[in-house]
Amino acid sequence: MFRWLPWKFFVKHAARRYGVLDPALLLARMRRFAQPSEVAEPLELLRAGIVFHARGLVNAKAIQHNLDWVWPYWVERQFNPADKSFVPRAFSFSHINLTHRNWTAVGLPGAPVYPIVDPRGLVTPLHDGWSLDFWIVTDSRRRLLPSKLDDEAVKQRLLLEPALAVTTACRIDGLRLDLATSMEIAEHGSAEVRTKIRAVSDEDGWLVVAVRPYNPEGIQFVQSIAIDSSGTAFRVNDEATVKLGEPPDSLRMAHYAEGDVYLDLPGKNGQREVRCDVGMATGAALFRVHAGIPRDLGVSVTLERDFRELPKRADT
């Protein structure tokens, strides 16, 4: 039935009504630039492009008006007029990552899931999901934020032995942060992405494990964050568990109207959960660091959502 409806007429009428180009006419004009083909534009590419720029529209709203937040590496570079990666945005239809599309997947043979690590150690455990970032904040409010560091302050390596891992070493003004991210098989047989962290500071401060509503492509919504009853794990969007290994010394959480949780650090807040209708919830677990003493921590994230969705992805 729907096949016989005059879709082209409806689309043309809607385009004329809202003063935009007729998509059917535009595609017909585009085809004239190439030799005739038996195959039109691949539907998969059109679908991917729609999703790609839909995220870009969200990025344009969320990032542009909140540049005081801590954003991923590509945003900190591409949105900075003083950086060589700067891309003017005044007439951009959408804001997408055009300059730093060089993240690394960590995985295991036989495990069809691919957590990724960006050039500054930002970990995205789930496919097209939210991320974990790691910071140092001192009592005098000096900060080591990997995404904001110059290239000279960061060294990243891909290790193949004894297991596949991405290591990221950050150094600045007496602060040092070392990260090693890999995927491992947990005791119960499922895979988890794990990050080993070592923080060293020349003064007392905090190691921060932060839940971030974005990934190297842009915004990825976080609607809820909650600490579990043991106090040693976050549950994010009710789809994955962030295991902290030990109870944090302090917790901070915020929804979009309150701004980025980063703006309130270190601070003290006993809030155990947050919900955000906008999808921009942020959370931070703080662990005390003493001057000159290395602070080690292991963080792991369960990947049950990605394993559960594998049959669905195979069908699309």
In which residue ranges do the predicted regions lie?
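Terminal accessory carbohydrate-recognition/targeting modules of carbohydrate-active enzymes
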Residues: 1-316
